[in-house]
Amino acid sequence: MIAEQDDKHARDHISFRKIWKDRDDEEPQLLEKILSRDNLKSACRRVKASGGAPGVDGMHAEEAKTWFDENGREFMVRILKGKYTPRPVLHTEVQKKGEAGVLNITVSTVPDRIIQQAIVQQIMPIYEQIFADGNYCNRPGRSAQAAGLKVLEYTQQGYTNAAIQNLSESFALENFGQLLNILRRNITDERVIQIIKRILKSGIMECDTLTACKEGILQGGTLAPLIANIYLNEFDQEFAGRGVPVVRYAGDIVLLAKSRRAAERLLETSSKYLEGSLRLRVNENSGRAICICKR
């Protein structure tokens, strides 16, 4: 079980201040790398280029460079001293283009987007080394089209059936501590873990009402998709160990099989692993076993 594997990574109840005072000696410079001026300036450029709606502070992405030039040094010092508190994400609903229904959108403030992007730039290379080959989620140079081609490649190898799972768009995670312990395997600077925790638990502002994030991972920002991807790497590695080809993109997971019966078994075992071991919510009635052979 994952919980047993992560026992050695668990931390006793330790205060936020003490973490900053007695930081890990194993990798004491990770936070400093994140906060290097070059890394932050690069993050700032990416945030500005990405655009997007303003968060709760009303600041537009186009203002990122101006804000950083005026406040960057103070921002860095505040984070280094453990005094950084992310703002709540702003929740809005946007009508889907060309179809019924709405998209739930959460938007971080520009300063929060900058530090999130700075973290991503430093930890992404760590996880690129351990992500599974069938993982096409939010990775450089990978796309939905490439994921589809990978599935096609497997069909040509005789994997003509598949079990398909779809995860809740809110990434409703019931065991947040388990996620933090998974992060600690590769991020040994506890200060960075605590910053990530604060970002993911910053709360949601909707109609001038602040709601605490009691479970799940807030998806308003650049960091959350990577964190969700890291967590789901547990699934990829588990089923790779069972000899099951897996292709994953966005919230969709495709497990390949050579027969309908095998696909149905995979549908059952993958549901148990997602909901039991990883404690994630699978979209109700979304799982299915299908034939993907050419007709």
Show where each model-derived region lies.
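Conserved residues at beta->alpha junctions
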Residues: 34, 109, 257
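Non-catalytic, polymerase-adjacent accessory regions of viral genome-replication enzymes
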Residues: 1-69, 73
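Short coil/turn segments at secondary-structure boundaries
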Residues: 59-66, 102-114, 135-142
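Conserved beta-strand/loop block within the catalytic cores
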Residues: 86-108, 112
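Hydrophobic alpha-helical hairpins/lids featuring a short glycine-rich hinge
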Residues: 105-123, 127-129
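Conserved polymerase palm-domain catalytic core
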Residues: 78-93, 130-134, 138-139, 145-294
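Short alpha-helical scaffolding segments that buttress acidic/His motifs in well-ordered protein cores
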Residues: 43-47, 118, 195-200
